[in-house]
Amino acid sequence: MFLDCTGFKKVLSNAIPGNDWTTPGDMLFVNSAVASQINYKDDNESQHPYVDAVAHDLGWIWKTPIKDRIGSGLCYNSSITSKQDAEDAFVEYWGKDRLRTGEFNHIDFTPGYNAKNWRANVIPVGLSSGFVEPLESSGLALMINCMAPLAGCKLMESIHQNI
């Protein structure tokens, strides 16, 4: 048994004939994101235990508050918005003075998932199994969905008993 943890490359999963990658592209219109680190305005700015998702003309913005900064990004459709336009909109939203480093991380992705998670002796895990959008909640759901069949298999019971 092999776990394919090779991310977007899906090295092991793609080697198996009949890889049924399902992309709901007609329902999910974003396929790119620009992300950066944002400074808090001041010490009183809220640090809360959830991610904000904010609608934007180009798509949507996520804001993940952590101890000393905010992780944020703008999801957009690259077929109608350039990387530069996305960066400009992101800076306009936050203000140039809030950017922590001035550096941007561009992420291009194809939303989708494996129609069947366990094929032959390969189980794709994490980004190898699918990617819907850059929020951890969907990634965690895909991870749990991939690992659930493994948790109940006889091989895992045998391994657990011998530990």
Predicted regions and their residues:
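Flavin (FAD/FMN) cofactor-binding core of flavoprotein oxidoreductases
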Residues: 97-124
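A conserved FAD-binding loop/helix module that cradles the flavin
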Residues: 131-151
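Short catalytic/ligand-binding loop motif for oxyanion handling, primarily in non-cytosolic enzymes
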Residues: 10-13, 114, 132-134
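Active-site-proximal substrate-binding core of FAD-dependent oxidoreductases
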Residues: 149-163
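Hydrophobic, Leu/Ile/Phe/Ala-enriched alpha-helical segments that form helix-helix packing faces
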Residues: 90-97, 154
